[in-house]
A protein has these predicted regions:
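RNase H-like, metal-dependent nuclease domains and their acidic two-metal-ion catalytic environment used
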Residues: 1-87, 114-196
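Conserved beta-strand -> loop -> alpha-helix junction used to position metal-binding or nucleic-acid-contacting
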Residues: 77-110
């Protein structure tokens, strides 16, 4: 899950489910609430631990947000329940076309992201997320996004580095059948050092 903390304004949390076999991401839940800070961050961590057994958070750490992972009550709760708190810093890399927020665009285009739309609550959450996606600007000119919230978009993007790592780890452990392009050799029949 990703957490975009806020001391004032809106704090956002976003939870993805990742299916390794289909390589698809599923939006499980999100929360976007006014106010925030440490009490709200701890509250969402507790709620989602109970509800989803969530044990990995990627938390933005620009400025004040660094205090979230350093807070004693959050550290104690995370330590007691085996929750990994991973920090991330965004700065200008959120606008990077390869690793930034807009790098998620092909996932939507290739239908590798599934957003739930069954039921009123799911529709409200998805509509809010989609509206923030529409107004998120990949341009570094911030004047385009003045007045537009992007908390949910950012919270949904924070776990992407972790998800990409999981994808690479899965590929690295896959058993691939290898057929050499040359014939006549068996792996066990070569008995010479041809490189000498």
């Amino acid at each position: 899950a990703g957490l975009d903390p806020a001391s004032t304004g809106y704090q956002a949390a976003f939870l993805w489910g990742y299916d390794q076999t289909s390589n698809k991401l599923y939006m499980i839940d999100m929360e976007n609430s006014l106010g925030g800070g440490i009490p709200q961050a701890l509250s969402i961590m507790k709620n989602w631990f109970v509800k989803y057994n969530l044990a990995h958070w990627v938390i933005e750490e620009n400025g004040f947000q660094r205090a979230i992972r350093q807070d004693q009550s959050i550290r104690e709760f995370a330590g007691k329940h085996g929750i990994f708190l991973e920090g991330t810093q965004t700065y200008s890399n959120k606008h990077d076309p390869i690793f930034g927020v807009t790098a998620m665009r092909p996932l939507f285009a290739d239908k590798l992201i599934s957003l739930p739309y069954l039921g009123f609550e799911a529709q409200e959450k998805v509509n809010l997320y989609k509206s923030q996606l529409v107004y998120f600007s990949s341009a570094q000119n911030k004047s385009r996004t003045v007045g537009q919230k992007s908390d949910l978009v950012m919270a949904s993007w924070f776990p992407m580095k972790t998800i990409r790592r999981l994808q690479k780890e899965r590929l690295a452990t896959m058993g691939l059948e290898y057929e050499p392009s040359f014939g006549g050799y068996e792996g066990s029949s070569i008995d010479i050092d041809s490189w000498r």
